Amino acid sequence: MNNRRKVLAVVVALVALSAGVLSYIVLTTPSSSPHAPGSPSGCPASVTPGVVTSTSGNVTAGNWTTYHGNTSRSGFLPMANVTGVHAQWAGPVGLDGQVYAEPLTCGNAVFVATEGDSIYAVNVSNGNVLWKTNLGSPVPGSALPCGDINPSGITGTPAIDVATGTIYAVAFLSPGQHVLFGLSIKNGSVLSRVVVDAAGANPLVEQQRGALLLDNGVVYIPYGGLDGDCGQYHGWVVGARTNGSGSLLSYPVPTGREGGIWGTAGVALGPNGNLYVATGNSEATTTFDYGDAVIELSPSLAVLDYFAPTNWAQLNSGDIDLGSVAPTIMPNGDVFQIGKEGVGYLLSGSHLGGIGGQLFDESICGGGYGGTARVGQSILVPCDDSLVKVVVGTSSFSVAWKASGFDAGSPIVTGDIVWAVNISTSDLVGFNLSTGQPVYSFALGSVDHFITPSAAPGVLFVGAGSQLYSFVLE
């Protein structure tokens, strides 16, 4: 790859959309699937057959059915090296809210969730809306004691069960209730609906920002607090069975207050079948209470292990969240963690280490935010001052390159190109995976915090404000 920089201002045409509001009825719940999202089987060749017409021979439908493409959140799409990129379409203008969630793909459709509490299925090839389902009225910012999203609707990235053809999303509904919906990916019809606020939680101060994890017939849902840390909130993980059986599973972070699980990658699944989350600061400074920690949970949400830095009390008192980035799962089960302090920690998958028991640690950047991407032993780390490539060995890691002066959104990798949005400039930038040199750049509209692209074979998607952009990879 040469170091050319391609700048494109994407011009969009207005598309008028009509919106319908669905009534809240408990409908038949789809059968449970033992398969985690990400399997290539089960995605239909066409959503709403007869409506879709392909206009580009360069785009092949593919499946990116959960945050960063798989349950370990690697964010890597293997493909031939990228030799060129061009904008395919931008639209549909008229999305009824901002896009914080990562777009997902299945079959010929890309699925977009909005803060207007709607899910859209959009044709991968031409950007036409295949269907739209509105799930209710979002919660206005004026109804919340603090926060920076207005209105608040669907914030966490949904998950698709390809075996049942169902997309699951948590909608925050006015006047203040979190509801897990299951929708048919074929036509957007509502298949299931369940309230997923944990017993004793106050929905008005619990934010569902982290990505959903679907595994073995359970949707795992992380919660943190609102921007401003107002109210008596705790971090939670709630589990809802897709077949509707039993009561909700739940794990409350045992803090006096705070300790939110708010990293956008949400819950990660390890090769051992256990779940990994990272928490933000709590108010504790004398007795450890699982604030600023990495926690390993069983599928039934029992605590199995944990790690916290030796300076956890200082991190707590300074609002220096370890959980500003979700855990990165290595192929052998080891865990990499970084937070606002910018210090990376390598943890053993067989024993996370308790307080101060890391295998290795080193300062990497000014502060990590969002979700990482991983290609083999290499991790791409989003920081507020740089995008950093870290290479992990058996018991340590080292920095391979650092793209400084880049306010990095959560990266993904397609072939030999690392893609990330510069949050400060609203540019989508492609970096050479080996060297860290910028190769491509595209100007977007305004973007939201922690935004991340998604990919399918030959195509890249990114949400910006209330817009979806598509790029063809050659």
Predicted regions and their residues:
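Noncatalytic, solvent-exposed loop/strand surfaces
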Residues: 25-474
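Secretory targeting signatures
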Residues: 1-33
